[in-house]
Structure formats: structure tokens, C-alpha cells
């Protein structure tokens, strides 16, 4: 896969996406890392990994608590390109305008090993998505989930990038 960082300065679309992620998550926008666009051509994949932190960043930066993966295009169910969670045996196909949202840590602050995930290679076509990670020094929120919601994953219906 290939990646590019999207800078906020002077870019209203990037600013708006960041504002909506902050509003949805309940975290301050300052906790968001810069948005990162990712592109997968046929045969390109991202091996299973955790988004907890970058070892090069420690101890200077807080660890990642929450991951947003925003799908920019829809891929046919049979075209591969799913986001896979091997430990959970879950595979999610990309659908434009939706986002996969998950905690990287448990409510008690420990690593959530279940969120190991990878990007499967597209068999045909190109997959585009935006990553956003939210960092915090301590779990200042027990969970990103709104009260009354349960489960490991959340999806933003109605298009995160819409007005």
C-alpha cells in the first residue's frame, strides 16, 4: 500500500473531516494525528498489526487509543480489499462514505489484542481510505462509544464526509 499525510492548514475538507471525527469520538481535536490517505493496488496488502503506538514515538507522545478508518470507495464483495481482524474472524468490505471505528485499548487502559487487523489485497480495482488515530496519555474516556451503545466496532452511516 501507499500512504500520504493530509495537512490541515488551508484545506477546508481535511479540517471538516477532523472536526467530525473529534465530535463523534468525544476527544479534543488536538488528540487527533494528521489524516493519512492509504491506497491499495491489486496485490498490495497491509499485514495484520496493532495501531497502539509507534515504538519510535515513545515516551514522547501519548499512545493511540482509537482508530478511524474511513472508506473512500466501494469495492465489490468479491474483489478482496477487506479490512480483516484475524483474532475476531471478522472481515469488513470497504463501502464509500462509511468508517470503521475501534478502540485500540480496553476500558481499563490495557491493550486490546482483539483489534489486530490488516488490509487484504484487492483482486481488482484500487482501494482508497483515510486513517485517523487518536492519542491520549490516559484513558480520559472509558470508551469512544456513546452511552447505550455496545460492541467493539462502530460504523458512521450517512457519510462522515458529508455536510
Predicted regions and their residues:
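Fe(II)/2-oxoglutarate oxygenase catalytic core
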Residues: 1-163
